[in-house]
């Protein structure tokens, strides 16, 4: 299986193309491996993440993602399953961007698990090329296409990733511009979107019911069990809402806090005031999905205005989001980050 091969080779020594330079926040290094269709990202010679662009994945993802201290914040399943993980939602891989209703097609839920007879209901994001690597600015620029199951291109996607590290904080900015390639491309409100992160077990909320997980040998348990060992994630948003109640609420930022193996880690997801329908609706779930959706509308909040965006051929729409990974971050620290993100010129 091609995607499994990509992961197995992930930690091997790379004899591949690399670019590095001193950035404002540290030395960013990109190592591109064209054979295995990936770009590894390092800061100060310490691993950060990998951009995976195999078209077997139905979309491009950043996976896995590590803290400064070397702890993985992403779920391993389905590419690299770990003991005691959940195996739900195989389309949740690392950090990604897509949506649940584009001209009636579901891009969000597509994965290798979808049966061939149902594939016509789903869309895929196909990689085209790496446009540019600029290590001095921590930038990776990519080109992709949103297509239907027959290969018809609905949207052209130009994405810029900006990777940085400062004072123990790692960040990923994603700026995605979508251009219509059809007479009309319609985004209809849907809860499944828009930028998503599937987190490690430590960041989940403790479960109240027995469930099936992978055992120590990587096999699914025969009998449901209640296992909350090491599980202690807590969400909070800019308005002070906590826990599972953040879901469906509009907020300019949502933070997820947990203790993983004795280290306090906070993951923060930021919306940008230039985005449509700012601030975005939270699509954060206790089982480990951490997402922010600018196009959710009534799909998550019946009192919200309806959301429907139509792009004529050649028209564009741009989304800007940021992920910050740090220690025990206070609300005031996060507010300052949000303000800086909104002030930054793109």
Regions found by a protein language model. Give the residues of each.
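Acidic (Asp/Glu-rich), glycine- and aromatic
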Residues: 51-57, 61-64, 166-214, 225
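Beta-strand elements of well-folded, non-transmembrane domains
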Residues: 144-148, 161-165, 178-182, 199-203, ...
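Active-site/ligand-binding surface loops and adjacent short beta/alpha elements
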Residues: 191-276
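Beta-strand-rich N-terminal accessory domains
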Residues: 22-90, 175, 330, 335
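Extended, loop-rich substrate-binding clefts of extracytoplasmic carbohydrate-active enzymes
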Residues: 93-168
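Bacterial N-terminal signal peptides
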Residues: 7-18
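Beta-strand-rich recognition/accessory modules
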Residues: 267-346
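Positively charged n-region of N-terminal signal peptides that target proteins for export
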Residues: 1-6
